UniProtKB/Swiss-Prot annotation:
Requisite cofactors: Fe(2+)
InterPro entries named in the record: TauD-like_sf (IPR042098)
Catalytic activity: L-lysine + 2-oxoglutarate + O2 = (4R)-4-hydroxy-L-lysine + succinate + CO2
Uses described in the biotechnology field: Being totally regio- and stereoselective, this enzyme is of interest for biocatalytic purposes to produce chiral scaffolds that are of synthetic value in the preparation of more complex functionalized chiral molecules such as natural products and analogs.
Cofactor note: Binds 1 Fe(2+) ion per subunit.
Main enzyme class: oxidoreductase
Entry's Gene Ontology molecular function annotations: 2-oxoglutarate-dependent dioxygenase activity; metal ion binding
Descriptive protein name: L-lysine 4-hydroxylase
Keyword Iron tagged: yes
The species this protein was found in: Flavobacterium johnsoniae (strain ATCC 17061 / DSM 2064 / JCM 8514 / BCRC 14874 / CCUG 350202 / NBRC 14942 / NCIMB 11054 / UW101) (Cytophaga johnsonae)
Length: 370
């Protein structure tokens, strides 16, 4: 395997670009007026529809998004939905989007299975409006929690602390695009931080941060790579279908990537050529990871899942630093929502009776609905 120094010698370090290579997400400072509008809208929708999964609400979601969201936020998201350009990082941080009532939220549950979704209802409405403005439609995946609804609470679980999952905490969660093992993975993701008292940085990596596609990246268009299921699955399958890591436009590609499962999983079953290519790519990509942002309560990170991978740093759940000492605190709690821009294109993969329920198991294989 080539050394990092040899790799760097082969890649042009300085090129003249007609655009600014994006290395960090756009940060939108939400105004107090916009925050107040969103709070009132969430309460209004909760009163009118009871649940953010109400079919009458979901089927008219795009209309409500453009009617009720603050205009500036709706315009930002609408542009974001079709911007695949060279200078688009693929993630937006809405700083201070919501005021989270910590007393109403109560103590963080032990795990996501114990989450009280009656306390999260208002946040589900607001997150869904953001997706609706793209416009994109909130969906759930059988491959994740056997569905579990369109809003998932992500909570550190002591029993899963060392895993490469959202429930983990004690190890760095390698950057990954959500559900890289699916052909019909989510198009857009939202991460609403209800609390992050441990001050855990969010890690982001954009395929656009490389600048132009180089020789290392060109090899990733070949459909020779294993995309194993993630650490939520117990079985180890190393002879699954193959796929490319980069896809779409050859000059401005999309990415399907999970460093933990494709490179560091000893049972991934990559061929020597595939593993070599992935490792060379990772040596370059890991230097482009952005870990500068520490989310606060009420912040939302909105991600194009075809452009930008996400992860997080390791942390000690329920412990924060204060005056140089670790003291107890409420554990981190986040809400994730996923969406697809078209239900037509995924119909062969969705439940017969619910086009919002994606039944894909692994790179085009569908779970048995019987």
């Amino acid at each position: 395997m080539k050394s990092q120094s040899l790799i760097e010698d082969e890649i042009p370090v300085k090129e003249n670009y007609a655009y600014q290579i994006p290395t960090s997400p756009l940060i939108v400072e939400v105004t107090p007026q916009e925050r107040n509008i969103l709070s009132n809208v969430g309460a209004l929708l909760e009163k009118a529809f009871k649940s953010y999964e109400n079919p009458d609400y979901i089927e008219a979601l795009h209309l409500y998004s453009f009617q009720l969201l603050p205009e500036r936020i709706a315009r930002i998201l609408s542009r974001f939905g079709t911007d695949f350009s060279a200078d688009q990082y693929g993630a937006i941080i809405f700083r201070g989007l919501l005021e989270v009532d910590q007393d109403h939220l109560g103590p963080t549950p032990a795990n996501w299975q114990s989450a009280d979704y009656s306390k999260l209802n208002k946040y589900g409405f607001i997150c869904s409006l953001l997706h609706g403005a793209v416009p994109s439609k909130p969906v759930q995946y059988y491959a994740q929690r056997k569905g579990g609804g369109i809003l998932h609470a992500v909570i550190p679980d002591e029993k899963m602390a060392a895993t490469q999952t959202g429930s983990g905490s004690k190890t760095n969660l390698y950057v990954h695009t959500e559900d890289a093992f699916l052909l019909h993975q989510a198009d857009f993701l939202s991460f609403l931080y209800l609390r992050n008292e441990e001050r855990v940085p969010s890690t982001l990596y954009s395929v656009r941060s490389h600048g132009k596609v180089n020789k290392i990246m060109e090899k990733l268009f070949d459909p020779i790579y294993q995309c194993p299921k993630d650490a939520n699955y117990q079985e180890e399958i190393n002879d699954g279908p193959l796929a490319s890591v980069l896809y779409g436009n050859k000059k401005l590609p999309f990415i399907r990537f999970d460093a933990a499962e494709q490179i560091f999983n000893e049972n991934a079953g990559q061929t020597p050529e595939a593993l070599y290519n992935l490792t060379e790519f990772w040596n370059e990509a890991k230097e482009l990871i952005n870990s500068d942002y520490i989310p606060d309560s009420g912040d939302v990170i909105f991600v194009n899942n075809h452009l930008c991978a996400h992860g997080r740093s390791a942390f000690t759940a329920g412990q924060k630093e204060e005056n140089g000492k670790l003291v107890p605190c409420e554990r981190r709690q986040m809400l994730r929502m996923m969406s697809k821009t078209s239900l037509i294109h995924i119909r062969s993969m969705t439940h017969t009776d619910d086009p919002y329920f994606v039944m894909e198991e692994h790179l085009g294989k569908v779970f048995d609905q019987a």
